[in-house]
Amino acid sequence: LHDAHPHNRPDQMAIHPVVRVHPETGKKALYVNEHFTRRLVEMNSTESDVLLGYLTKWVANPRFTVRYRWTEGTIAIWDNRCTQHFVLNDFVGERIIQRVTIMGDKPQGNKPAWKPWIRPGRLSATSRHDRQLYMYLKSKKLIDVD
C-alpha cells in the first residue's frame, strides 16, 4: 500500500508491486520508499514492517548508489521508475534545486502469488496499518465487506 498522504484518504493511496518491471527496459527494480510505502498488502502489519524495514535499508546500500560531484551549472536527471533520490548533506555553498515530475505509467509487476492479507474478523485486534489497508480495499471494492 503506497500512501502519499498521511490522513488515511483512499483517493491518495494506491496498491502497486514491490518489484516493478520497467516498461522500456523490462528490468526489475524494487519499488518501495521509506516515506510513502506503508505496508505489504499480502502480509499482516508485523510481517510487513519487518520486510519493509529490510527492503528500505537494502535499496540505500552504498553498492547500489551513484555519487555525483556537483559543479556550477550541473543538471541531474534520473528515472524514478528504477532509482531513488537520497541526499547526503556533505556539500558546501548554495544549491538551487528545481524539480520537474512527469506523470508516468502505472507500475506493473508480475502477477501476485498471494492475496491481500485481511484481518481474521471484524473485531480482531489489528494495527492502524491493518485497519488502513482494510478500509482502502473496502473502498475500492477489492474485498467482500463483513
Name each region found by the language model.
Residues 1-65, 75-77, 81-146:
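Active-site environment of non-heme Fe oxygenases that use a 2-His-1-carboxylate facial triad
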